[in-house]
Amino acid sequence: MMIEYLLGLLILIFPSVLAWGFIEVLDCQRVLTVLEKLPLAYLFGLGIVAWEMLVLQLLGKPFSPLWLLTPLLGASILFSAVYMRRKRHLKAKPQSQSPWLKEHWSKVDIFLLTGIGLELGFAFTRALLLPMEDFDAVTNWGLKAKAIYLANGIPLGFLTNREYATVHADYPLLLPLVESYVYFLLGHINDFAVKWIFPLSLTACVTAFYAGLRRMTLNRTAGLAFAFVLVSIPHLVFSATNAYADILIATYFGAGFFYLFLWIRQRNDLFLGLSALLTGMAGLTKSEGMVLCLVNLVVLMWAVNRERSVDRPHGWRQVLIYIGVFSTVLMPWLVFRLSMKAQNDYIHELRVERVVQWETVMRMKTILYHYQAQFFNLKSWNLLWLAALGLFLFRFKKILQSDQKFIFLATAMTLSFYTSVYFITFNDVAWHLKTSFSRLLVHFVPLVVLGFASAYLDSAQKD
């Protein structure tokens, strides 16, 4: 069993090595630190595997170790060659050597880092010891992964068979594809070997978050404090142990927004490119990811529209490039989905009369009840939502006058869309809220904590 665990980890590390080379090629000016490259390599590695498998499916090639590894090895050699060629002409910049690690470590820093380590350790322990047992982990993501492995490809007949009502053929396939990739290289199905994906995603989320805060000029202690706030949220940690896709989409969306927010503040085009790639991968992960792509795009358009008129044409060109990048990431999935004529359950069942009827309006009472039940659930969320409400009420004007308004816009748009689903759902709304709302909140938890950190930074700079 231990060997299977280690093999599963090594199989997931391999595409991360390839992604590291890809990041080195992108980072031609040596801007990123090692601490930033590590989570990016992991996240891009998963995305590259899913993207490659979708392309193989469209080309009619079977999923086998040979077909899976050959393109990855070829791309790895290509990226390495480009990187080595550039390295001879570039001098290393000081910031690329992670100067943050050389700072003095105070007792508070060590305490916070220990706390973060304990929370992550709990996530790894729980994820790796418990089997896949939660409903969607077994009947949706895990079932699709096993079907892909057994069929040596994505089985259209299985996905579109209405008898398998829990499958949701229209759901993006990043997670099932990555799980099946592990199965293919292992040579058999092993649910424990793929469970590395989830605590590693939480680790990547926290690391990318901390690195983003340091880029915003927060000192180490403050950065670690907010990273600890993020990783100490019980339901976020739980989502990294139950084999659901929510921790993945939270990480992709969160990291994509972090780099978009850094671009707004610093105007480094590398950050905008990273944001576009990560945002596109969020769209490959869950259906909600398509909306999250739109959220980041709206934030970018608003930021560009605020620029001086002389800079605005260049800004709109960057918007078009941003759309082009995340559309390239999404294209194989969109083409495949179109080819199998999959329909979204909610859109397919949506009727105008359902939206305008009085019963729909009366759902507000049920929705508000379940919202407050989550927001006051300190056991699952600590004081996160109450603190967020307090911050919004007491700093409303300052939020609108600073870059924090972009965080508020992204959070408000995401919550508004998710709320609209409960108004139009054809399921019993109370049941739907009980089974999904807590998971949807996970998606923008990193943005809320980023709002706290940004408010603290603005206050500290004024003082």
Where do the PLM segments sit?
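Membrane-interface alpha helices of multi-pass inner-membrane proteins
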Residues: 226-228, 259-260, 264, 271-287, ...
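Transmembrane-helix motifs of polytopic, lipid-linked glycan transferases
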Residues: 75-85, 193-216, 255
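Membrane-embedded, hydrophobic transmembrane alpha-helices
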Residues: 1-100
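Transmembrane-helix signature of polytopic, membrane-embedded enzymes
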Residues: 31-40, 189-192, 209-232
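Membrane-interface helix-loop-helix junctions at transmembrane boundaries of multi-pass membrane enzymes
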Residues: 102-107, 214-222, 267-269, 306-320, ...
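Start-transfer (signal-anchor) and selected internal transmembrane alpha helices
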Residues: 63-123, 321, 395-409, 461-463
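Hydrophobic, aromatic-rich transmembrane alpha-helices
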Residues: 180, 204-213, 373-408, 412, ...
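Membrane-lumen/periplasm interface segments of specific transmembrane helices
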Residues: 130, 298, 302-306, 315-397, ...
